Amino acid sequence: CDTSIVEESISRLNKNNYKGIVAVKSTVTPGTTKKLSEQYPNLEICFVPEFLRERCAMIDFVENHDLCVIGTESEEVYRKVRQAHGHYPKNFRRLKPTEAEMVKYYNNIYNATLITLSNSFYEVCKKMEISYSDIKNSLVLREHISDSYLQCNDNFRGFGGVCLPKDTLAIAKLVERLNLDIDFFKMILDEN
């Protein structure tokens, strides 16, 4: 995950003796906010991920803004950032910065997994000459299952943006660095 823009921006704020809260919203590798906080102890840095889909960011911000995660060790920073977000988020959650960073990855890879699962079922249905659309539309009648990320067609398959492949690759590399024997994230990339 390339964090150079975030690091450069925070370095500039530090050089200019910035005194406010720095809320990082860009997806960064888990541990980045903690590292930057240690590097710039005079800045109050927190991680506040956005959960916007590329194709409908405005609608997500206004209508589907159901969660605001604030990654900070400071109660005061949490309070101020929460207040700054006003009434849009339905839920607020204070976590450690690294936990908040991981929530963002979990969200995106969860969505990538749904795409992979849907494309696989689409292929099975196509081979069996049955309607994926009818099956999917029946499934989403269950209250806990959303229609998001379940659309499939012959013209375009796999990821439809830059965030999901980028974040899945970043977690696959993190798993490698941690010497974990988990192929799941690489499988998602291979399938998309």
Where do the language-model regions lie?
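A short glycine/serine-rich beta->alpha loop
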Residues: 155-159
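Rossmann-like NAD(P)(H) cofactor-binding subdomain of soluble oxidoreductases
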Residues: 1-56
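Residues that form or flank phosphate/diphosphate-binding pockets in enzymes
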Residues: 31, 79, 166
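ATP-dependent carboxylate/acyl-activation modules
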Residues: 173-177, 184-192
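Internal alpha-helical scaffold of NAD(P)-dependent oxidoreductase catalytic cores
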Residues: 35-48, 53-148, 174-181
